[in-house]
Amino acid sequence: MCPMTRCSVALLTSLMFFAGVAPADSAVPAAPPVERCASAPEVGFAQALVCYHDAIEQQPLIYTRVGTSNVTGVERRDYLLTSQDWSPEGLVTPARWQHDVAIYVPKEALPTRAVLISTNGTRHPLDGSTAQPSSELPPEALAALAQRTRTVVIALSDIPNQALNYQGDANPRREDDSVAYTWSLFLKAPQQRMTMPLHVPMAAAIARTMSLAERELAPLRIHRFVLAGASKRGWASWHATIADQRVEAVVPFVIDILNMPAVLEHMSRTYGGNWPIAFDAYAKQGITSQLQTPAFAQLVQLQDPLRYLDTPYRKRLAVPKYIVNASGDDFFLPDNTQFFYNALPGIKALRVLPNSAHNIRASIVDTLAPFITRLQQQRPLPQVSDTLHPGKAPQIRFRSSEPPTQLQLWSATNPQARDFRYACGIRYSSTPIAHANGGTVSVPVQVPDDGWSAYFVEATYADGFVSTSQTYVLGKQRYPTQAPPTDHAACSTLLGATSGAAVR
């Protein structure tokens, strides 16, 4: 069924101001500071994200309440939010970004804190099709999360707005096609297009939603937010965390790309100079062939959360964070965390979801619930540390400050390639680990005779919270010398600059 916020736009546009709230399609006044953020010499690449956020937050807050309903005993309040007009140099249409916002308020909701989950959706459908609401989390799942945690849950859709049309481009673009295209536009003129990468307006829309929630949830004094999102929406959640001090914790799902230069080099070498087929949009826009250029280094300054460690925004990366990755991600390698996890300051936990591809939506609620409950109860996360001790008898040493109720080792082997994608038929199996009285265990692992093996330790705690070690990949060689074999499209790779093959 089409949600009320999508079916009632014509009616809503005729509404007048009420309770200090503007109709959803009221004109957004021109804001010169927004243009300044795109190209002013005094705004550097590491400041553009925050500059744009601050400029948008200075604009009037434009939204309309469109209805109230009940979902399995939880009150749901629906809004239509206009977050911004975004069209650097007039290159993008439609410029106006609108979003369905659903706020789930459980009975006896705890005050001050809310969870904000960014989701997808198609607000501007292609010719001949209809607008589509978010497909990531059903209302029942969001209501269940609110009930289980006694926490207000906010679902923000249309991150990013899509499909978008770009000047001179005949193809309306969505998801990674849209992200990659904005990157290609940025790379052509970085100094003039610092607000061009699509994550910039995505992060600003998250901030606008926090402002809406503060106003509408004033009786609960909501002013602190836990951000969550998957893939590019998880990336935007990192960016919103950097830009907005109202964010007190972040849970990014399947966006295992901090320290972009090191991670991308590792990925290219792992695939024998090729790229996973999931990178198709970025390869088509020439992104993967520009990784060594000065322009890409400037993109990294803006895009890469880890680069903000060297800026005044370093403290924003110290908020509690629960990084959730997939063991068989279509985009990212299971051991990418080696390039960034230990460098992240502050309270943190890692979870690797075994036998999962990039689409991990079924695990989001069960992963979030114990994390949020611990925040609400002011209970610390378990402090976990792990190291690989190599040698003739390699071991993973795993230590937890809190005793788990279950401890197991997950492992998978690919005898042909350093490739652990779920789409390639790789499956992990688990082995129980005896608990150690002292909190530290040494877990034997093996270097396979052929190919590579991946290992991680998983700890489950009494409240259902799950924390894992980083994933360690062992083989007689660190990297292969050729691209992995494939027998179907989802498991293929794309030609890279250093590869001798086309599509394998």
What are these regions (language model features)?
Residues G229-H239:
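Glycine-rich nucleophile elbow surrounding the catalytic serine of serine-hydrolase chemistry
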Residues H124-S134, R150-A204, I257-G273:
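Cap/lid segment of the alpha/beta-hydrolase catalytic domain
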Residues H239-L291, R351-P354, I360-S363:
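Hydrolase active-site cap/lid region
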Residues T93-D169:
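Short, surface-exposed "cap/lid" segments of acyl-processing enzymes
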Residues V28-P111:
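Catalytic-loop region of hydrolases
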Residues K188-S231, V247:
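Gly/Ser-rich "nucleophile elbow"/oxyanion-hole loop immediately N-terminal to the catalytic nucleophile
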Residues P370-S411, S430-G439, P444-Q446:
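Surface beta-strand/loop "capping" patches
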